[in-house]
Amino acid sequence: MMIHKIEPHKYYPEFRNQEPKPSDYLLLFDGEKVYLPSHTENSDVTDTSAGAGISEHPQVYLPTFEEVHGLLGIRQPMERFFLDCEYLFSIDDRAFFRKTTEDAGALMLPEEDLYASGVFRNFEPEYLAFAGITATQINRFRLDRKFCGRCGHPTIHSTTERACICPECGQIEYPKISPAVIIAIVDTEQDKILLTRYAGGSYRHWALVAGFVEVGETFKGAARREIRSEEHTSELQSR
């Protein structure tokens, strides 16, 4: 998912101490899985265009706080349900928040409504797919930084920036961004392009040559290295 695919929508990633509203989107996580209900569970949902869907599960959608509160039959007032929610980002004037089942008092979610992050590859519309993918990345960062990597003490969330702070030794951890390159190798005479297929992993589709930039390496250097490693083992496919 590329950020330009959410146009004409605008993405606002800056950190905010913002309180949620019932109409804001909630990404409710159980570990690394996210809660995505279906429209058939909520007969009151009328705006299916905003709810999105997945090609093989077209009725699955990204819910708001109000919808989650009603669907799961949560008895506590909405104001209390808002507690322990993390503001993630906004797209246009809609805010997105993260909450975990642990934060919600060991809330039990229906197993059939829990999905791995790969579900957002085929999510529609694309700006909500982008939101889901970005939210799962932040969720993974929080899960991986529950404890300090230096002294092992439990970390806390910063109140001034998106970071995990160790109150014991002062170590600060930020979300990691891994620079990568994607290269289109084209044979203009044959009107073909070089595509690869991964030997392992869950993604089995054809893809362009790509790879991560190593420490101290330039983007051009990474592109050359990836081309050398792939060009003898890949196939040329017609465009």
What residue ranges belong to the model's regions?
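Acidic, metal-coordinating catalytic segment for phosphate/diphosphate chemistry
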Residues: G132, T136-I182
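Surface-exposed, charge/polar-rich loops and edge strands
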Residues: E217-T218
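N-terminal alpha-helical interaction blocks
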Residues: M1-P125
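Conserved small/polar residues in nucleotide/adenosyl-binding loops
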Residues: E231-S238
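N-terminal strand-loop-strand
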Residues: C164-L208, F212-V213
